[in-house]
Swiss-Prot record:
It is found in: Cell membrane; Endoplasmic reticulum membrane; Golgi apparatus membrane. PANTHER family: SODIUM_BILE ACID COTRANSPORTER 7 (PTHR18640:SF5), SOLUTE CARRIER FAMILY 10 MEMBER 7 (PTHR18640). Strongly expressed in small intestine. Moderately expressed in spleen. Weakly expressed in skeletal muscle. Not detected in other tissues tested. GO terms for molecular function: symporter activity. The lineage of its organism: Eukaryota, Metazoa, Chordata, Craniata, Vertebrata. Gene3D superfamilies: 1.20.1530.20. The gene is slc10a7-a. This is Sodium/bile acid cotransporter 7-A.
Length: 343
């Protein structure tokens, strides 16, 4: 495979590197109040576009069937909002004995308390060909659940309390997730034949929107003068984040593929991504609300800012491997279910 062909195939990873570099060179473009106006273009337009796109591309019957998959939804929500933060808290009891910056460690705990993302898990599940409808439901449901659960978890593990405006966050999520999804489904009914004939690149469109989200996030990071990190702590945190993601992806994979799990290979794909991914678009505003007035807010935010692109990068790299496994597993299951021809 030639270099250009390889770059074309891995364009999303290349895009992540380029947008981070662009944010580093000129962060003022994508900061809040800057020319791109991310407080509008990202918070409302970008997230709405991702879910309108999903509503347009998803068959209604697939979305309806996903609502009934209670066992899968229960697994994902319990893993991401109960097991994840508890396991990280235990892990941090050991890490607190090391010279790693204590505020970065607190940041790791805040990452664990976040709900599933409203975009990346859906996009990666779609890229693999997994149960996209289940991923969408868990992303939306997890986000709404996170409005109440995440502040309570932060209070439990970090002792931070604040009057969180549940109503405004809930209404914002409803307008940017549920409404665009429904509108997308309605529009699909009228242009269904055209969509099936033309097959628009829905996955690529969502990925481009996600690159914009990453760009503005890093613009905020690089333009913040309060972030003062020692190289050792930063490198160790990056390593720990990748370790956590790989370990939890493997754990959810083993659980969901166990003999009596009852999950299909497509379900496993949605479970692996939805259970281990954490929301940045909901997480950063939530941290700003819960940790209002904290001088170390920027340091606490760093692990989440690293975790978000790391989960996309790692997920993108693993897409071909997971897709290959899913297809081979589906083929094997299909063969075992075929009736044997009597001799």
């Amino acid at each position: 495979m030639g270099l250009l062909e390889r770059l074309r195939k891995e364009w999303f990873i290349v895009g992540i590197i380029l947008v981070i570099a662009a944010a580093k060179l000129e962060p003022t473009v994508g900061v809040k109040g800057g020319p791109l106006k991310p407080e509008i273009t990202i918070t409302y337009i970008a997230v709405s576009a991702i879910f309108f796109n999903s509503g347009l591309s998803l068959k209604t019957e697939e979305l309806t069937n996903a609502l009934m998959h209670v066992k899968l939804h229960l697994f994902v929500q319990l893993f991401t909002l109960v097991f994840f933060p508890t396991a990280i808290w235990l892990f941090l009891q050991v890490l607190s004995l090391t010279p790693i910056n204590e505020w970065l460690l607190k940041g790791l705990q805040t990452v664990s308390c976040m709900p599933p993302p409203v975009s990346s898990a859906v996009i990666l599940t779609k890229a693999v060909g997994g149960n996209e409808a289940a991923a969408i439901f868990n992303s939306a449901f997890g986000s709404f659940l996170g409005i109440v659960v995440t502040p309570l978890l932060l209070l439990l593990f970090l002792g931070s309390s604040s009057s969180v405006p549940f109503t405004s966050i809930f209404s914002q999520l409803f307008m940017t997730v549920v409404v665009p999804l429904i509108i997308g489904q309605i529009v699909r009914r009228y242009i269904k034949d055209w969509l099936e004939r033309k097959k628009p690149p829905f996955g690529a469109i969502s990925s481009c929107v996600l690159l914009m989200i990453i760009y503005t996030t890093f613009c905020d990071t690089f333009s913040n003068p309060n972030i003062d990190l020692d190289t050792f702590s930063l490198v160790v945190i990056v390593f720990i984040i990748f370790f956590i993601q790989l370990a939890f992806m493997l754990l959810t994979f083993l659980f969901s593929t166990s003999k009596n799990s009852g999950f299909t290979p497509a379900d496993t794909v949605a479970i692996v991504f939805c259970s281990t991914h954490k929301s940045l678009t909901l997480g950063i505003p939530m941290l700003k609300i819960v940790f209002v007035g904290y001088e170390h807010l920027s340091l606490i935010s760093v692990p989440l800012l690293i975790y978000h692109p790391a989960q996309i990068l790692l997920g993108s790299v693993l897409v071909p491997t997971i897709k290959s496994w899913m297809l081979s597993r589906q083929k094997a299951l299909k063969l075992t279910r075929q009736p044997k021809i009597p001799l």
